[in-house]
């Protein structure tokens, strides 16, 4: 069995990764977030209780599991403490089991102001950002202008770096976007006060994870967003600002690639997307409405309605390739219950020419017309089914067809939001 597993979304995010992380964590000792920030939205349902996590790893709901926020994550301390406060009635020891890399870049107030100002200025061409400062924080990291968690514990160093960064960003806010500048002293005092609360959680995540591995612990790497939102491999420029693919797990945690283990690709039984960007299989008819309503397709972070469409096997195959996916997990199968016909995009037609590979970039994808293969639906309910043999024959055929198109084995099927509404086809851990 594999010692570690990487959980990756293979679509545009919202694939149901949080539930699967929570379910698999029963067999793990640590969970690691390695990219993104509090723009993620992982919804977990346990019994009658629903918990939505944005920054803290989903393994926090399992007792005795250590949770890590790796160096690849951009950290908003205010959002972190807010989430911890919300968790406290349910997970009173969350702060004691959470560890944060000292190398995490900080999201500061000017990042949020810039994010919102930039999005508003783009008008109809806007990307659909969450407005939480994620993109500007990553820009500062690449520009080597970022303030990191470690800087919080050195007042003079933090103040000097803040002054330099703020001088630049306030100029942009005032003279380009015509916005009010951010206040240096207010930011300095507010964030230095947060340092005491952060201090017990700050560690060298790479070293801690290496020690856990040496002790035989199983580590789960929790991806946020999805492959098609990857800054390099996604539908650029309608992407997030980090590497959401499996390779990001190594760079964003300090664990070597050879130690990542099994790569589990999570995909919905249909396709959704939040925000702008091309979406070849998007539905604008009553079936699209059916999927949105039955699937409760509203973003956990933004509250925006998700766009819905048929399953795209071309995109899945590309995601499996760039992630090195070992096995597939298909979620929300129960949403398709009752449809007479289900379609899967198996290729694209571009200017009359058939192609079977996902094109790079948004412009090329926008020109693609999907070529569909049809499958019979099923009238029986799959909600809550926990054994493969209990699924309708048509549902099994549909799932097997997806796996065949992806050239990957079926590992897990999710048939509902509860952690136990799950079918295991292949042992992972």
Curated annotation (Swiss-Prot):
Stretches assigned to coiled coil: none
Gene Ontology CC, one term: cytoplasm
Binding site for IMP: 14-17, 39-42, 130, 144, 225, 240, 304
InterPro entries: Adenylosuccin_syn_GTP-bd, Adenylosuccin_syn_Lys_AS, Adenylosuccinate_synth_dom1, Adenylosuccinate_synth_dom2, Adenylosuccinate_synth_dom3, Adenylosuccinate_synthetase, P-loop_NTPase
Annotated positions binding Mg(2+): 14, 41
Enzyme class of the recorded protein, top EC level: ligase
Compartments in which it is found: Cytoplasm
Assembly notes: Homodimer.
HAMAP family: Adenylosucc_synth
Similarity comment: Belongs to the adenylosuccinate synthetase family.
Function: Plays an important role in the de novo pathway of purine nucleotide biosynthesis. Catalyzes the first committed step in the biosynthesis of AMP from IMP.
Protein name: Adenylosuccinate synthetase
Organism of derivation: Acidithiobacillus ferrooxidans
Native organism taxonomy: Bacteria, Pseudomonadati, Pseudomonadota, Acidithiobacillia, Acidithiobacillales
The encoding gene: purA
